[in-house]
Swiss-Prot record:
Cofactor field: Mg(2+); Zn(2+)
Source organism: Psilotum nudum (Whisk fern)
GO process annotations (BP): DNA-templated transcription
Keywords assigned by UniProt, alphabetized: Chloroplast, DNA-directed RNA polymerase, Magnesium, Metal-binding, Nucleotidyltransferase, Plastid, Transcription, Transferase, Zinc
EC primary class: transferase
Quaternary assembly: In plastids the minimal PEP RNA polymerase catalytic core is composed of four subunits: alpha, beta, beta', and beta''. When a (nuclear-encoded) sigma factor is associated with the core the holoenzyme is formed, which can initiate transcription.
Protein name: DNA-directed RNA polymerase subunit beta'
InterPro entries according to UniProt: DNA-dir_RpoC_beta_prime (IPR045867), RNA_pol_asu (IPR000722), RNA_pol_N (IPR006592), RNA_pol_Rpb1_1 (IPR007080), RNA_pol_Rpb1_3 (IPR007066), RNA_pol_Rpb1_3_sf (IPR042102), RNA_pol_Rpb1_clamp_domain (IPR044893), RNApol_RpoC1 (IPR034678)
Catalytic activity: RNA(n) + a ribonucleoside 5'-triphosphate = RNA(n+1) + diphosphate
HAMAP family hit by this protein: RNApol_bact_RpoC1
An example Gene Ontology CC term for this record: mitochondrion
Gene Ontology MF terms in the entry: DNA binding; DNA-directed RNA polymerase activity; magnesium ion binding; zinc ion binding
Function description: DNA-dependent RNA polymerase catalyzes the transcription of DNA into RNA using the four ribonucleoside triphosphates as substrates.
């Protein structure tokens, strides 16, 4: 529903028959009411003009050419008039042809049909409201082969009845033919049947209309309350059955509350009037050679009208038409409407002559290429761009890299204002020429503009709020957006070709919201569960594992370091280093590699956590200067002759030294920030 004056909103829900009729019906100056589509025809095969009362009728949906009626008469369109003018001969309104994009029609069904979304989709709303098995309802609606003669009896207490029937029952054709005529005349039997007995969608509609939602909610709540008081029986199967019943009651209460809150009646889930979409949304196009290409919806609408008109003829001649034939025709109408709404939901879809399934209304609106995601949510907007994302591990968590070509387009208005404000350009044209020529000064101004201006990155589909996050942009070379890999968890993105959209917040309020609430380093936890979102990826974990890997032989295998030279194996003593810088310098000079075992002098507090607590060292070496070296599994201590500790060396690798240095620098930087 769209309100032009206040604001625009789109609400999807059930529409009443009166609302559907109000969408389509119009009253001509002659008093004739138009809007009902009664013929299955589209265009005349010779003139290619819309057929009267057909799916493209100009009286119902508006003129094909602005100001021209079906007769070919012309009258200037005056949108300022309060009342439109109509052609006296054909009844077509003299108005703009664009009304065919929103003017609707309707088909008056000869029998009520259930809306397949509310019957077959799980959970089935109709089955939940009526508290009946879905299989029984389907057999009632479609007259399935399993229960071909299933009817629903609803005696009305206020009126006299001769049959004490209530609920589902089966009948045979012979019983109707021989039993009831003994008590009723033909007209009396028809009146009795329409009052007491129903089948198909009519039976479901009557059941839904008889529901008192408040009473249903109160009774269901009392039943749930009684079950909740029961203690577990100890039998696993019985307890599961009771839990399923309780879950069903909770779903039923929620559904009834939704109907009461939205002021929607349950019987609206059964259609008596079928809306017909505007012609421009289901076009028929003529190509070269006179060939007509049509939307699948037109063929599905035609099938509905054909079957509905056949049912109308059967009902008009009901005295001579077998009851079973009427029931089968009602089923055909139900199946045609189901195929129009959601083709294939009940099994095999309806196909065309090329064995291709028809594209139904559900197929048009759902999915990535549907009306909502592609046409409504996927529209292009100003100050936005889109590109492939690539990994940028050197970037801070809150920064992203924007290509120069994209950044100059997104921030062009701000750059122009900067050029004119600094008197580097006389007017708008000069500023645009400078940008087009890519003069060096524009990159300096662009960096100044981007310095305090965050951007929003979005990856579709946006399933939660972390699908859109703010970043501080920087200029990079290339044509891809550079992103830190740790922020990919919130976007559910990876670097195998994923694309992301960039949006520039313009107002100060939007920029403040992006800076204080949406920056990526402030969204490290999931808002739903509280679990960390920024977690290391698999390639990070693999890199850390390789960086910190060591020889599994321990102290017994790395006392001496083997290396190969000309197919000969030599042994060098494991080197000693005094600091991180010495280790990294030796790595740069290729004296060692990341996996080389080394002894590193350690000046801090040593806390050793091992699986085996050793009271004595593995080995004690004595030197000539009365210095002893106590060698343990992961460290060694040098002591003087009095037992005082002179130095401490730990066994590690160059890769672990590099990793530990990065961790220490990050922690110290965080402490300085606070």
């Amino acid at each position: 529903m769209i309100h032009k004056n206040n604001y625009q909103q789109l609400r999807i829900g059930l529409a009443s028959p009166e609302q559907i009729r109000a969408w389509a019906e119009r009253i001509l100056p002659t008093g004739e009411i138009v809007g009902k589509v009664t013929q299955p025809y589209t265009l005349h095969y010779k003139t290619h003009k819309p057929e009267r009362d057909g799916l493209f009728c100009e009286r119902i949906f508006g003129p094909i050419k602005s100001g021209f009626c079906a007769c070919g008469n012309y009258q200037a369109v005056d949108n300022g008039k309060e009342f439109s003018s109509f052609c006296k001969q054909c009844g077509v309104e003299f108005t703009e042809s664009r009304v065919r994009r929103y003017q609707m029609g309707y088909i008056e069904l000869a029998c009520p049909v259930t809306h397949v979304w509310y019957l077959k989709r799980l959970p089935s709303y109709i089955a939940n409201l009526l508290a009946k098995p879905l299989n029984d309802l389907e057999s009632l609606v479609y007259c399935d082969i399993t229960y071909p003669n299933l009817y629903l009896a609803r005696p009305i207490a206020e009126k006299p009845t001769l049959l004490q029937l209530k609920g589902f029952f089966k009948y045979e054709d012979q019983s109707w033919r021989y039993l009831f005529p003994r008590f009723f005349s033909t007209r009396g039997f028809e009146a009795f049947k329409s009052r007491e007995i129903a089948t198909g969608g009519d039976a479901v509609r009557k059941e839904l209309a008889s529901l008192n939602l408040k009473t249903v909610m109160e009774c269901t709540y009392l039943e749930w309350k009684d079950l909740a008081k029961q203690k577990p029986t100890g039998n696993e199967w019985e307890d599961r059955g009771i839990q399923r019943i309780k879950d069903f009651m909770v779903r039923r209460i929620r559904l009834v509350k939704h109907f009461l809150y939205t002021d929607v009646k349950p019987e609206w889930m059964v259609l008596s009037l079928l809306p017909v979409l505007p012609p421009e949304l289901r076009p028929m196009i003529e190509v070269s050679g006179g060939l007509l290409l049509t939307s699948d919806l037109n063929e599905l609408y035609r099938k509905v009208i054909y079957r509905n008109n056949t049912l109308i003829d059967f009902l008009l001649r009901s005295e001579f038409t077998p009851e079973g034939l009427i029931v089968c025709q009602k089923r055909l109408v139900q199946e045609a409407v189901d195929a129009l709404i959601d083709n294939g939901i009940r099994g095999q879809p309806i196909r065309d002559s090329h064995n291709r399934p028809y594209k139904s209304f559900s197929d048009i609106i759902e999915g990535k290429e549907g009306r909502f995601r592609e046409n409504l949510l996927g529209k292009r907007v100003d100050y936005s761009g889109r590109s492939v994302i690539v990994v940028g591990p050197s970037l801070p968590l809150h920064r992203c890299g924007l290509p120069r070509e994209m950044a100059i387009e997104l921030f062009q208005a701000f750059v122009i204002r900067g050029l004119i404000g600094r008197y580097l350009a006389q007017n708008l044209r000069d500023a645009k020429n400078m940008i087009q020529n890519k003069e060096p000064i524009i990159w300096k101004i662009l960096r100044d503009v981007m310095q305090g201006h965050p951007v929003l990155l979005n990856r579709a589909p946006t399933l939660h709020r972390l699908g859109i996050q703010a970043f501080q942009p920087i200029l990079i070379e290339g044509r891809a957006i550079r992103l830190h890999p740790l922020v990919c968890g919130g976007f559910n993105a990876d670097f195998d070709g994923d694309q992301m959209a960039v949006h520039v917040p313009l107002s100060l309020e939007a920029q403040a919201e992006a800076r204080f609430l949406m920056l990526s380093h402030t969204n490290l936890l999931s808002p739903a569960t509280g679990d960390p979102i920024a977690v290391p990826t698999q390639d990070m974990l693999l890199g850390l594992h390789i960086l910190t890997i060591e020889d599994s032989q321990g102290i017994y295998g790395v006392r001496y370091f083997p290396y190969s030279k000309r197919n000969c194996t030599s042994f060098f003593k494991i080197p000693y280093f005094n600091s991180y810088d010495d280790v990294l310098r030796a790595k740069e000079q290729r004296q060692i590699h990341f996996y080389s075992p080394i002894w590193l002098r350690w000046k801090g507090f040593l806390r050793v956590i091992t699986s085996i607590n050793r009271e004595f060292p593995i080995e004690i070496q004595y030197e000539s200067s009365n210095i002893s070296v106590h060698i343990y599994e992961n460290y060694q201590i040098r002591k003087d002759k009095k037992g005082n500790r002179l130095s401490l060396y730990i066994r590690t690798t160059a890769g672990r030294v590099l990793f530990n240095q990065q961790i220490e620098e990050a922690i110290q930087g965080t402490l300085k920030a606070f």
